[in-house]
Amino acid sequence: MSKYLISLILLSVISMGVSAQRITRQYNNVSFSAALKDLNARQDKYVINFVYDELEDFKVTKNIKNESVPDAIMNLIGFYPIKMKQVDNIIIVECIQKASNRMMGRIVDTRHQPVDFANVALLNVSDSSLVTGGVTNENGQFVIPCEVKKAIVKVSCVGYKTYCNAYRTGEVGAITLEDATINLQKVMIKGHRKYISRENGKLTLDVQNSNLKNIGKATDVIKYIPGMLYTNGKYEVFGKGEPVIYIDGRKQTNTSGLSLLSSTNVKSVQLITNPGAEYDAETRSVINITTVHHSLDGLSGIVGAEISKHKNLSNNEEVNLNIHKGALDVFLAYQYDNTRSDIRYDVNQFNYEQDTFHEISASEYSDRSRSHDYNVGMNYAINKNHTIGGRYLGSISNYKMLDSPFDYMQTYKNDELLTATDNKTEESEKERFHNVNLYYIGKLTDNLQLNLDADYVYAQLKHKQQVSETSRIDAVSEITHMRNDQRNRATALKGVFAWNMNKNDRLDFGTDFSKISSWGMSVNEEGKIADDQFKNKETKYAGFATFSLSASKWKGSIGLRYEYIHAINTDQGEVKNKTNYSDLLPSLSLSTMFGRVGMNLDFSSRVNRPSFRQLNNSVSYNNQYHYEQGNIYLKPQYVYDTELIVNYSIFDFKLDYQYIKDYIHPTVVAVSGKPGTVTWMSTNAKDFQQLGAQCVVSPVFGCWRPTLTVGVYKPYFTLSYNGEQLDYNHPYGLFAFQNVVALRNDWLFRCDFFWNIKGHHGIYEQNGYSSFNMMVQKQLLKKKLTITLKAEDLFDSSKLNDVKRVNFVAQNRKVNNFNRCIIASISYNFNSFKDKYNGSGSAEDEINRF
């Protein structure tokens, strides 16, 4: 049973007058666990706690002479990734690298003598980038924990020729170094670690070993993922839409969690553009953020403030605290955001239903949004195999339209002026959000782990709107009041098993359940629009399994996800739609290496279900000719996505083909009895296809790290417009050139250019727009204090301009969000704050659909 000993604790009775105990011992090629066990038995002043299996692979050869127990242990540790912590008479020894695999061996010379203090580096077999490394001990032995199953072992030592060879993880035996003749000269060697890599189809940014470490917040880090777009506060993966973001396995419902995470605490960021069966069926792309793990007891945190100037000033303040004591973590976070924003619309719309109605409108609004976000929770490690925790997330948000400098509309019927109005809009929203999550993470056996999550969610949105329309012709005013109230509730449970069947095979399987209800009403006091009461209910049962295997140069996985949905949509107390969805969604991944060229083939099938906003029947009033409404008959769309990825050195290529069945897109319908008046809503088309390609180049030139991303997508889509078939097939593209220069004395400079190239995005033909951004940053007080100055959209070139043609309406819309701005921020870190919550949440997809 010694192989499975969790910790060795020998209780000692310390009597008065006992002097300090010293140790003299000789250890020759014994395991670290055996040496600690021996030290513990030979004295009674200290109690040594450790995990036997964790340290057994580390061999030690050491002569201990008259040393204290702590000094003897530190002497044994040497260069191994092991740390010792002493609390009074308790000594805790643990491996600081918790990887599941280990590369182990012994370095000798041609005379079979051990080579000590040799550098052993593990390199990625695909691109030779550094994975991790270690140093040999006095007996020439090394043990290096790592996450990979195969790596290039590179051994270097002064006086010997460098050795390189590929091995599978485990015991590699003895490696012999040949002698080398060296002419010593004054030489400076400077290396650069590759910070963008691709493995098994997943694009990874090594944040800790790049200049992104000090960029600011996690929100800033994500912007520098190749192929990532950031427009008006939203992230979008090129050709894939909005991604789902995870932090340490915990799904994020908004960007507040990202803004509370400092980039210094981000270890890596991973982009998955073709998720497998383990992810929810509606997920088309995933961003996984892994944070740096700290184990220091005490208080840690971050405080920060930011001020920005667009047309108006906005400000943001935050404080995050984390208290870590032994097995308990308690964390609290609060953020206040006061955002002033401005937006201008210019709309030119033609309605060809029967007569020709031509609408010309222009409006500009200034509004304010104030929000309070808070997060409190705890994690408790019962022991090394079992952890429990919980958290509460809350948000209070209030929105109000402050001013409308101008808002007018002119309508022509068959080229004759029909109406001309000056409009005044007053609008406000109150939003409340509450989420309670409980979780359990347990290691049931050495090869089987279980994750459990339970969620309860409640959200409420109240919206009020008053639109005053004054005729320029007869000065008659007309007022329209709209009031909407929507509430959402969800409960969810999720369980996931991870079974390491053997060294090369793994099976992940799990299930989740959720029950959602959404209800509300819309009221028009003047009776122009019929009042409405709606209620939506949805129950979901889901299960998945993913089998992963590796053999020689090949790695692969096959997954299957099943979801059953029972949905009921009620309007005005009458059941309008009662549907059962039963979907079986397969996924497949295959990767290999041909020399230094890596290849990956992925296939996934997903389903995107309508949001409750798209389904509810309430009407939003824009003006007398323009409404917006949900569609209770809207069906889910099914996405089938195939990717081929090839990477070599600094180059990364991707080909992508997407087929979407029952494609969801905007459309327009006429309002009965009101000529010229239309309602915009979502509907389904038969299908949609697009073919895409993307190339990323990421070299390093000294202190300059440029990244070039070029991509293009060609859509294939046809709809009926004005009695004829219209193709929406113009390709759209992306060009991004990002540059970072790391200067001396902790100065950092960035200069980035983004260009979205004109083309069709569904029914929208979007004109090209661009953004040129600059940033300078300085760190002080040993990098605890960070001061940043940014200038975004310097040339004011990010204005949107699109044309949509559908059914009998053509609309040209120009939008100016006044993105040009200056941002100044300051943040102070103490003890490197990190949110340590380990739960993943089980209701996140339901929250997003609200």
Model-identified regions with their sequence ranges:
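N-terminal periplasmic accessory domains that precede
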Residues: I91-I96, G170-E178, A218-V221, T255-S256, ...
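Outer-membrane beta-barrel signature, preferentially recognizing the C-terminal barrel domain
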Residues: K535-E538, K576-T579, V607-K661, T679-G692, ...
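Face-selective signature of the C-terminal outer-membrane beta-barrel domain
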Residues: D373-N398, N423-Q572, M593, V597-G598, ...
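Outer membrane beta-barrel strand-and-loop segments of large Gram-negative receptors
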Residues: A490-K494, K540-A542, K635, D641, ...
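Short acidic/polar hinge/loop motifs at secondary-structure boundaries
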Residues: V143-P145, Y224, R250-G276
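N-terminal export/assembly leaders
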Residues: M16-A99, S128-G133, R193-E199, G233-V244
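Surface-exposed extracellular loop regions of Gram-negative outer-membrane beta-barrel proteins
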Residues: T290-A305, R344, N348, I360, ...
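Short, acidic, small-residue-rich periplasmic hinge/interaction motif at the N-terminus
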Residues: L36-Q43, Y80, Q86, I90-S100, ...
